[in-house]
Every structure is written in C-alpha cells, then in structure tokens.
C-alpha cells in the first residue's frame, strides 16, 4: 500500500466515527453590503445592506466539519435563550447533528462574531470590520453543570474527544478534567484547540495551536526561525505532557512534534494566496481528531489536516471540507 493509498483508506474510515466535541459554540454572522458613498458624519463607508448569513462557528464549526467529513459528531456546549442560540440549534438540526448535549441558559448570550463585508455590486466583498459579542459563562453556571452531568452519563460508543476553547467560559478546570477522564476511560484520543489558555490543558493526547498562540503561551517570538519553533515544540510536549503538538503556521505549513521523534515539517498544501482563513483552525483540529479516531498515526493525521486546511482557506466565510474533497486532494498531490 502506498502512502496515498494509506491516507485515502483513513479518510474512508472516517465514516461513522463518533467524536464528542466539548466546545464553546459561536454564531458566525456575515453581513454583506454594497458601498454607496462616504459618510458626512465621519470618514467611514455607507453600505446598503444586501444580506446577512449566520453559520456554525467556533467549536460548532469543528462539529460541522466532522459531519461533512463523514464522522458522527456529538456536540456538548451551552447557548443562550436568544435568537442566535435558536439559530445554532436549527443549523445543527438541518445538518443532521443531534444536539442533546447542548444546553441553554437564561441570562447567557450566545457568543456572536459579526463580520461586515463590503464591495461594489457584482464584486467580491472584503471584510472591513468584525464585532465580537460575548460575555463569559458564569462560574456557577447551571448549564455547565448540566453539560458535565451529561458527559459523565454518556453511554454511547465514542472514538475520540475534541475540546474547543474560544475563551467563552465553558471550559473551567473541573469540566476539562471530566473530559480527559472520559477519554481515558474509553481509551480514545482527546485533542484541544485553545485560543487563550493553551498551557491550562495538560494530559491531552494532542494540541493544535497556531504559531501566534504558541508565541503568546510561551512568551517568545518564532518568526521564520526553525530552531526557535522546534525548541517551542519540545517545550510544549514537556509542559503539557501530551503525545503530539501540531503547530499550524499559515503559509509556512505545519510542524508536528512527538516525544522521541524528529520534528515533521509539512509544507502548505495548495496556494498561499488564500481566500479566507475564517475557521481554518476548526477544520484542522476536526480532521486531525477524526483521523486519530480512525486509527491514524499523528503523522498521518497531520498530513490529512494539512490537506483539509489548504482546501478550506480557498473558500469564503466559515466553511467545511468533505471526505471526497480530501481524497481528491491526496490523489492530486504531485509532491508525494
């Protein structure tokens, strides 16, 4: 079996793999408008509203990617009793994703990231501003306790656990311990993508930070210095006690670190002239986790995540990748 055949067989094994996703669930809102003129009130554009689109964002985007890749995601999280919370539930339902692990809470506002995109008629719209609306979940949140109870009582077979932390307050230390203990009891991989608190997540199978998150966590600057990158990778392995660290590096590709192995540097798949990076990290961890759940080694999972990341950044807005697209990318890669 060639390397390509092996990777394709892993993609084929995605189907039906059940991945529990413990996540901050975010509504990604895209507001599109046509430029009409400059305002007389301030030096800003006046837009005529064309459309508003709401998509599954944050950890919900990882859930969506697992679904489109052929897996069976089990989302666990909290939304508000508000319009965006209802919209997220509806979007999950429309995609055939059960939301029995998603709880709502009065007084909590569903996190929303609103992006305003502007352009002339019949032209590609460009993002001009983003407005984030969220307040962290309360420390004694009843909905968080409900998530923990549901997690402890879950009896379904699960092949992997994905933790997505966007800093919205769901993932306190107790809930993280519950997730790690759940994965260990089931003897399945558990991965994490944390925007602001990477060093808080010890005992995971793997972490998938981007390079700026590594720099922020360790208080260093990597730039294009491979030696600094490799030193950072080794430091994270030691401090987090994990089996793999996958660092995403934008146009420089990815780097995988495992204890006792030489670093694996993976060049970017496709072009470095991207259309939109929104949610690319969600696609990467979804693919990486699903591959581990399907029996891939960390190196194989990283290769597949690199393909998926290269595909999704060529799409506009928060997007997903399918198993067919992933298999086609493997077959079409002339570098291998």
Residue locations for each model-derived region?
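Flexible glycine/proline-rich, aromatic-decorated loop/lid segments
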Residues: 37-42, 204-213, 253-281, 327-335
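Structural motif
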Residues: 20-22, 130, 159-162, 191, ...
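Conserved post-catalytic alpha-helical subdomain immediately downstream of the catalytic base
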Residues: 239-243, 269-333
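Active-site metal-binding loops of divalent metal-dependent hydrolases
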Residues: 25, 166, 283
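Conserved N-terminal subdomain of the carbohydrate kinase-like
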Residues: 4, 10, 16-19, 27-162, ...
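Conserved phosphate/ATP/ADP-binding segment of small-molecule kinases
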Residues: 168-263
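Extended, hydrophobic alpha-helical segments in both membrane/secreted and soluble proteins
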Residues: 162, 179, 190-200, 214, ...
